[in-house]
Amino acid sequence: MAFVLSLLMALVLVSYGPGGSLGCYLSQRLMLDAKENLKLLDRMNRLSPHSCLQDRKDFGLPQEMVEGDQLQKDQAFPVLYEMLQQSFNLFYTEHSSAAWDTTLLEQLCTGLQQQLDHLDTCRDQVMGEKDSELGNVDPIVTVKKYFQGIHDYLQEKGYSDCAWEIVRVEMMRALTVSTTLQKRLTKMGGDLNSP
């Protein structure tokens, strides 16, 4: 687990180099919040993931959306926003409160909310008139289905400690993917199709 965390943190740190600006400092503040949220998720570890191997599940993380050219420029920002919103929704529940250290959980929810608030300040600059179309964007539907699968899994498992541990590890993967997407947005100044 320590090796995996080190690898994830290294990937996140690599993405912190100087990048473009969307006029709202997306690359700086958002990336710092993302790094802190990953650290908090790591600190929330209460069980060894090895003790929960029987509960493992492939949630079908839609990584292909941030790899290669599958995600269009006008879809990247809403996908990032949706991933963070769904992450917040997952941890801001009564079931989550019962499973985790309250202080760490509150810090994580605050960090996710800060990322969302920051994205809200950038949304108009990046999206313009596209906001009304967000519900119909296929990648957004894919993200929603992914998180619905996580909610369904937790319910199936009775919100057990092992189920939450599996979800915690999965959320580290998801937030790492969202960090990769943030990196692409900032590196290209919001234009995913630029060289």
Swiss-Prot record:
Entries under PROSITE patterns matching the protein: INTERFERON_A_B_D
Alphabetical UniProt keywords: Antiviral defense, Cytokine, Disulfide bond, Hormone, Pregnancy, Secreted, Signal
Gene Ontology molecular function terms on file: cytokine activity; cytokine receptor binding; hormone activity
Gene3D superfamilies for the chain: 1.20.1250.10
CDD domains according to UniProt: IFab (cd00095)
Tissue occurrence: Constitutively and exclusively expressed in the mononuclear cells of the extraembryonic trophectoderm.
Disulfide pattern: C24-C122, C52-C162
Principal subcellular localisation of the protein: secreted
Keyword Iron: no
Compartment(s): Secreted
Protein's GO biological process: defense response to virus; female pregnancy
GO cellular component, one term: extracellular space
InterPro entries reported in the protein's UniProt record: 4_helix_cytokine-like_core, Interferon_alpha/beta/delta
Keyword Transcription regulation: no
Function description: Paracrine hormone primarily responsible for maternal recognition of pregnancy. Interacts with endometrial receptors, probably type I interferon receptors, and blocks estrogen receptor expression, preventing the estrogen-induced increase in oxytocin receptor expression in the endometrium. This results in the suppression of the pulsatile endometrial release of the luteolytic hormone prostaglandin F2-alpha, hindering the regression of the corpus luteum (luteolysis) and therefore a return to ovarian cyclicity.
Record's miscellaneous remark: IFN-tau genes are intronless. They evolved from IFN-omega genes in the ruminantia suborder and have continued to duplicate independently in different lineages of the ruminantia. They code for proteins very similar in sequence but with different biological potency and pattern of expression.
Family: Belongs to the alpha/beta interferon family. IFN-alphaII subfamily.
Protein name in UniProt: Interferon tau-5
Lineage start: Eukaryota, Metazoa, Chordata, Craniata, Vertebrata
